[in-house]
From Swiss-Prot:
SUPFAM superfamilies: UDP-Glycosyltransferase/glycogen phosphorylase (SSF53756). This is UDP-glycosyltransferase 79B30. PANTHER family: GLYCOSYLTRANSFERASE (PTHR48049), UDP-GLYCOSYLTRANSFERASE 79B30 (PTHR48049:SF67). Flavonol glycosides (FGs) with glucose at the 2''-position of glucose or galactose at the 3-position of kaempferol are present in cv. Nezumisaya and absent in cv. Harosoy, whereas FGs with glucose at the 6''-position of glucose or galactose at the 3''-position of kaempferol are present in cv. Harosoy and absent in cv. Nezumisaya. Expressed in leaves. The gene is FG3. Belongs to the UDP-glycosyltransferase family. It catalyses: a flavonol 3-O-beta-D-glucoside + UDP-alpha-D-glucose = a flavonol 3-O-beta-D-glucosyl-(1->2)-beta-D-glucoside + UDP + H(+). Flavonol 3-O-glucoside/galactoside (1->2) glucosyltransferase converting kaempferol 3-O-glucoside to kaempferol 3-O-sophoroside. Has a broad in vitro activity for kaempferol/quercetin 3-O-glucoside/galactoside derivatives, but cannot glucosylate kaempferol 3-O-rhamnosyl-(1->4)-[rhamnosyl-(1->6)- glucoside] and 3-O-rhamnosyl-(1->4)-[glucosyl-(1->6)-glucoside]. Has a higher preference for UDP-glucose than UDP-galactose, and no activity with UDP-arabinose and UDP-glucuronic acid. Represents probably a dominant allele of the gene. InterPro entries: UDP-glycosyltransf_plant, UDP_glucos_trans, UDP_glycos_trans_CS. Keywords: Glycosyltransferase, Transferase.
Length: 459
């Protein structure tokens, strides 16, 4: 089969973690001669532009996000709202459907990549475009919660069902705690935009795709991808690790200067992504746990629920006690550059797939502190299956962590003489070496491009 340059449209979920993940894949596709039309709102585009390494091949196409009642006037992505308002962002994204159809009709791409827009496959089929579901969540998560073995539209998922993996699942050691299963079961009844149930939206998006793609490699998630392929009776491909190219900007001076004042590998960096808003009590336990380590730390976290700023949420006397060694910041940060800074030795992560991809190719040790959704099963895979990090202990019933449990996990991974730390460091180093193998990455992307050609040609 003779290959030709493809025209690919991208319309990811309006969360920066998803947007950046899609754009990193675009960079890999652009190197191989493919043309990309990346559909995104203006505020997201401004943040994405430094990550566009091939502007001659990757074009941003602006989409206006309609206002939905309950959202701030200028809300365009999940970074602009608290977690409870994310369904309204989804509703706003659904309301762009007609505009997307108009854009795709004019652009005439060969394929469209999507994730949360369950209506995309039907729209694409009507226009003669192939639909690729590009999943930034791990196949571990999708296999556990959304395959036909687990999921039936219109039926409830009970808490007891979710405590154990579904029949045929590749790893019986990956399980949910009581409080996690309770939340997953309750979410089965939750709508997520436009009065569509969250699980229905995700299941339809998967079930109606022409191709299912995962940002991973088979060396790490192969059995889970095979399981999903059998369950949905669809082709499932890995794009490879998609190692992030460095952004074109330098680290902001306030962070580079601050980090530069500490010894190599000594700083604990904590970040929970653009979507996570902690409850006040968990925010307090987190920052007090960081203080308790006695180590220098940089925490990039949003203000907790009910607070306008992180400064107003600080415990009394905290800022004075950690002055000179503690930096709590409430805005968006250049995480990729921070993780690569030589002073950073530990990363407390919420276990979002994007953050884990960035972390695994750096040398910082991982402390796993998942919050919601796929983060939980990502943490199990990283902590239990791959053993590349230590998960913060939480109460089985209430899911609460304490300052002591935060401090304990950090202390374990930062102690070079601890047996758990030795094992985690060795496993992390092995996977890092695997992921940084440029031949591995290149072969995956080449194979992925070939599969896209086959889908377009109907092979």
């Amino acid at each position: 089969m003779k290959s030709r340059p493809l025209h690919i449209a991208m319309y990811p979920w309006l969360a920066m973690g998803h947007q950046i993940a899609f754009l990193h894949l675009c960079n890999k596709l652009a190197i191989r001669g493919h043309k990309i039309s990346f559909i995104t709102p203006p505020k997201a585009q401004a943040k994405l532009e430094p990550f566009n390494l091939h502007p001659n091949s990757i074009t941003f196409v602006t989409i206006n996000v309609p206002h939905v009642e309950g959202l701030p006037p200028d809300a365009q992505t999940t970074a602009d709202v608290t977690y409870p308002l994310q369904p309204q962002i989804m509703t706003a994204m659904d309301l762009t459907k007609d505009d997307i159809e108009t854009l795709l009709t004019g652009l005439k791409p060969d394929l469209v990549f999507y994730d949360f827009t369950h209506w995309m496959p039907a729209l694409a089929k009507r226009l003669g475009i192939k639909a690729v579901h590009y999943c930034t969540a791990s196949s571990v998560m999708i296999g556990y919660t959304l395959t036909p073995a687990r999921f039936h539209q219109g039926t409830d998922l009970m808490e007891s069902d979710l405590m154990e993996p579904p029949e045929g699942y590749p790893d019986s050691s990956i399980k949910l705690q009581t409080h996690e299963a309770r939340v997953f079961a309750a979410k089965r009844k939750d709508t997520f935009g436009s009065n569509v149930l969250f699980y229905d939206r995700q299941f339809i998006a998967l079930n109606e795709a022409d191709l299912l793609a995962y940002r991973t490699c088979r060396e790490i998630e192969g059995p889970y991808m095979d399981y999903i392929g059998k369950q949905f009776n669809k082709p499932v491909v890995a794009t490879g690790p998609v190692i992030l190219d460095p952004p074109t900007l330098d680290l902001e001076e306030k962070f580079s200067t601050w980090l530069g004042g500490f010894e190599p590998g000594s700083v604990v960096y904590c970040c929970f992504g653009s979507e996570c808003t902690l409850r006040p009590n968990q925010f307090l336990e987190l920052v007090l746990g960081l203080e308790l380590t006695g180590m220098p730390f940089l925490a990039a976290v949003k203000a907790p629920l009910g607070f306008e700023t992180v400064e107003s949420a600080m415990p009394e006397g905290f800022q004075e006690r950690v002055k000179g060694r503690g930096f709590v910041y409430g805005g968006w940060v250049q995480q990729q550059l921070i993780l690569a800074h030589p002073s950073v030795g530990c990363f407390i992560t919420h276990c979002g797939s994007g953050s884990l991809s960035e972390a695994l190719v750096n040398k910082c040790q991982l402390v796993l502190l998942p919050n919601v959704g796929d983060q939980i099963l990502n943490a199990r895979m990283m902590g239990t299956n791959l053993e590349v990090g230590v998960e913060v202990e939480k109460g089985d019933e209430d899911g609460m962590y304490t300052k002591e449990s935060v401090c304990k996990a950090v202390s374990i991974v930062m102690d070079c003489e601890n047996e758990t730390s030795k094992r985690v460091r060795a496993n992390h180093a092995r996977i890092r070496e695997l992921l940084l193998n440029k031949d591995l990455e290149s072969s995956y992307v080449d194979s992925f491009c070939m599969r896209l050609q086959e889908i377009v040609e109907g092979i």
